[in-house]
Design a protein with these regions (language model features):
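Short, Lys/Arg-rich amphipathic segments at extreme N-termini
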Residues: 10-11, 58-60, 509
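N-terminal amphipathic/hydrophobic interface segments
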Residues: 21-160, 174-182, 187-193, 252, ...
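Immediate N-terminus of the mature polypeptide
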Residues: 7, 20-21, 233, 245
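Short, intrinsically disordered, low-complexity terminal/loop segments
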Residues: 18, 63, 816-819
Length: 819
């Protein structure tokens, strides 16, 4: 019966994969793939632990005591589903379940193994005792003892024992104790009068020393972490973890910083079938350097609200706040990689979607600005608008008689978070701004698109037409007076209309082809493709300078935006006029055997049939006519070119350029070289240049093509020095500012046994005049935990191709050491 069932199951798999619409007893195939369905023919038979079959094997055997006692000799073994016993001689009593093993006795149970001179074990009661055991448990812990008692299936007690998480012979650390108890179900080991040895030297003693035997959650003190930064000094943290329930836990972390004082941090995580989230925060009652309280709070929440009228409703919330703009810069060790954030998001969103064509959301979004208020390059008008609230409804239907139809309507109330406390503290205390520096208002937007994609082998063509309609209701705060001569809040045109409307048709035609031919590259056969693309766009001109600008900015010109409808992104406050065509050409060289791309060349450029007339300006009225005239002289966009080459399987290079054809000067340049010769080995070189964009707002009306933009070079890598030591580093240098913007240097150690250690130094710019330094030191001991602050997120985000030298732990199987 077993063979027949196994054969039937093996035959079932290819049959179902061959016929996608076939209905079977085991599953139902549909357009979404095969999904399993319950069947009464298949039943899971539970194993009775008290009535298990016993198998024996040996070279010779003898039966005594009315066939109830079996004596096995020569490679003897007794097997049950939950335990295996081996030895040179085994006596097995079938009535009592007692097994006595002599000579190289071994017990293998649930992936753990115990070897001793002799052992007694009851296969029914799961109890026993072993003399001079040497053991290895499933989680990787090893040790030895004078005597061991198997109290039950989850409890092992040992006398005069040694325990270590290092499985190699030369153990870095171990615990020595007159009595060690290991509780597998509680993930806990307890050593009475235990002494911790490192490199054979006793470093810590405790009358009740606890340790975890598996990498699972357990209530207790975690190992302390340490940090060193230039702004906070030496930091010390001692976390306490409280495992409230399998789906709830709390971590409390008292901390001390030598330049700041004491801080208390906490984190609460929760998980339920319909919702989950995390709440964390810190509080410092009095910063000894600034003499004021410092705090932070972060909350994320996701929740399923259920189904109504065929729609699934959900709720998301994100809230982040800090006591001041310098919090993350001062406490970068608390929130690594957040020191350069400029805005903290505070939002709550009610969303819905379902099996029909409609989806939407209602959200409220606010911000906390972390700009350096003393930096002249961060004026108050760089603060973002808040959306309080925003309501959006979207409908999508594809392949509707060959047509793709989408429509979206959004209503947003914009409020600028500029209040008197900002201006009088950071701008000019002599000015009275009436609490407003920018206009507030409501924007109504509707955009419906209809396209008819025609896709055939080797070519496609997609005509599309859309209608955009928007209406603005704006409060320019004309009721306020400005006694100190402050200019009025005005639009780009200098007007202050309360209501503005705009309706624009948008038409485009996107088409492309793909040609292939056989060729060679680097002396090997390749398939070369030639992929021309033409994108025509027409949008009539509408005067828009009297419309406020809430969330719209100029997009970066690249291969993605070259084929887009609007050169402005973020919102719909400006829609460019267009009578233009974008021409693009891509050629690829593909490996014939694997399809891997060995080389690719891309070029693209826009050509304007009519000169652009819509521009993005500021709120203050400025004369941008001269800038506009110079810009309007251009009949084509910048020329885009990019080439990527896989010189070998481990060496890749990429070069990109953006040429301003108006004056034949580079607007942007990018070049990179990346080499990954083997595991834990990488090297990357990068050069970036970006010229300053056109100056179309501000009081200094200069139109310059000087090479004074951003110009940076970066080198990063990970390199093995020996089989145990690895160097990591990165250096970013600004050629324009003539200074380092980031430096990282570190050394990693991994002994392939139980120890991983890292020391990393990082220095990075937090503004044009300020930098921060930090030192990360971490030591990880298998089975004991980690000491120090974790720099892995810094290394992963900063070094392309970085690999953790510590092999990730895999889930252990009970058959890990099956014999």
């Amino acid at each position: 019966m077993r063979k027949k069932l196994t054969l039937s199951f093996l035959m079932f798999l290819p049959v179902v994969s061959s016929y996608a619409e076939q209905v079977t007893t085991f599953g139902i195939a549909n357009n979404n793939g095969l999904r399993l369905q319950e069947s009464s023919r298949l039943q899971l038979i539970k194993q009775d632990k008290n009535n298990q079959t016993t198998f024996t094997d040996s070279e010779t055997f003898k039966v005594t005591n009315n066939n109830n006692k079996i004596i096995l000799t020569g490679g003897a073994q007794v097997r049950r589903p939950d335990a295996i016993l081996k030895g040179e001689r085994i006596t097995y009593d079938r009535l009592t379940g007692e097994v006595v093993s002599e000579g190289n006795a071994r017990l293998i149970r649930d992936g753990s193994r115990v070897v001793g001179e002799g052992l007694k074990y009851n296969v029914d009661k799961k109890t026993g005792e072993i003399n001079s055991p040497v053991y290895r448990i499933l989680s990787g812990g090893v040790g030895e003892a004078r005597f061991a008692e198997i109290v039950d299936e989850n409890h092992l007690r040992m006398d005069d024992a040694i325990y270590s998480g290092c499985s190699c012979d030369n153990k870095l650390w171990y615990i020595k104790s007159p009595e060690v108890n290991i509780y597998d179900d509680e993930n806990e080991g307890i050593a009475k009068d235990g002494t911790l040895y490192i490199k054979g030297v006793p470093v810590f003693w405790s009358p009740h020393l606890e340790f975890t035997i598996k990498k699972e959650r357990k209530t207790g003190w975690l190992f302390p972490t340490f940090s060193m930064t230039s702004r906070s000094g030496f930091g010390w943290n001692l976390p306490f973890f409280w495992n409230i329930a399998p789906n709830y836990d709390v971590t409390l972390t008292p901390s001390y910083y030598s330049k700041r004082g004491f801080m208390l941090g906490g984190e609460f995580r929760y998980l339920r079938p319909s919702f989950s989230g995390q709440l964390s925060g810190t509080y410092m009652p009095s910063d000894s350097k600034l003499h004021r309280n410092r705090w932070s709070i972060n909350w994320t929440h996701r929740q399923k609200l259920g189904e109504f009228a065929g729609l699934n409703f959900g709720l998301t919330a994100n809230y982040s706040g800090v006591s001041d703009s310098d919090y993350y810069r001062d406490f970068s060790a608390v929130a690594i990689n957040r020191a350069q954030e400029t805005f903290l998001d505070k939002n709550i969103t009610l969303s819905f979607g379902g099996y029909n064509y409609w989806s939407g959301y209602l959200s409220v979004q606010k911000y906390q600005s972390l700009h350096d208020l003393t930096d002249p390059d961060n004026p108050i008008y760089y603060y973002q608008y808040e959306r309080v609230p925003e309501l959006s409804l979207k409908g999508e239907r594809y392949d509707w008689g060959g047509f793709d139809v989408t429509t979206q309507a959004t209503v947003t109330r914009f409020v600028h978070p500029t209040h008197e406390k900002y201006y009088r503290a950071s701008w000019n205390p002599n000015y009275d701004f009436g609490g407003h520096y920018k206009a507030d208002g409501v924007r109504y937007v509707s955009y419906t698109q209809v396209s008819y994609p025609i896709i055939r082998p080797g070519w496609y063509i997609t005509p599309k037409i859309g209608l955009h309609a928007s209406h603005y209701t704006t409060d320019w705060y004309t009721q306020y007076t400005y006694p100190n001569g402050t200019p009025f809040i005005r639009s780009q045109a200098g007007t202050q209309y309360k209501n503005q409307s705009r309706v624009l048709p948008i038409m485009s035609l996107d088409t492309g082809m793909t040609f292939e031919r056989k060729t060679t590259l680097f002396g090997k056969p390749r398939t070369q493709t030639l992929e021309p693309r033409i994108y025509y766009l027409y949008i009539p001109y509408r005067y828009q300078s009297d419309i406020p600008i809430y969330d719209t900015s100029v997009s970066n010109f690249n291969f993605g935006t070259a084929f887009s409808e609007n050169r402005y992104v973020g919102g719909w406050d400006r829609i460019n006029d267009a009578n233009q065509v974008t021409l693009g050409l891509t050629s690829r060289w593909l490996d014939e055997d694997t399809g891997k791309e060995r080389m690719a060349i891309q070029v693209a450029q826009k050509f304007y049939f009519t000169k652009p007339r819509v521009f993005l300006g500021g709120y203050d009225y400025i004369d941008t006519q001269r800038v506009r005239e110079r810009y309007a002289e251009k009949s084509r966009s910048e020329f885009l070119a990019n080439m990527s080459v896989a010189l070998t399987d481990t060496l890749n290079t990429e070069v990109g350029a953006q040429l301003d054809t108006y004056d034949n000067r580079l607007a942007q340049t990018y070049a990179s070289l990346r080499w990954f010769p083997k595991n834990f080995t990488s090297l990357s070189l990068t050069y970036r240049y970006q010229r300053e964009p056109y100056l179309i707002e501000g009081t200094d009306q200069q139109y310059s093509y000087q090479l004074n933009g951003k110009e940076n070079i970066s080198i990063a890598g990970q390199w093995p020095v020996t089989d145990k030591y690895y160097l990591v580093g990165r250096h970013d240098y600004s050629l324009y500012e003539k200074r380092s913007t980031q430096s990282i240097i570190g050394l990693e150690y991994h002994d392939k046994c139980c120890t991983t250690a890292r020391v990393v130094f990082q220095r990075y710019a937090v503004s044009k005049t300020k930098s921060n330094s930090a030192v990360f030191l971490q030591v990880e001991l298998n089975g004991l935990g980690g000491i120090g602050s974790d720099p892995l997120s810094v290394l992963r985000n900063s070094i392309p191709g970085y690999q953790n030298v510590k092999t990730p732990e895999t889930v252990k199987s009970p058959f890990e050491r099956y014999e």
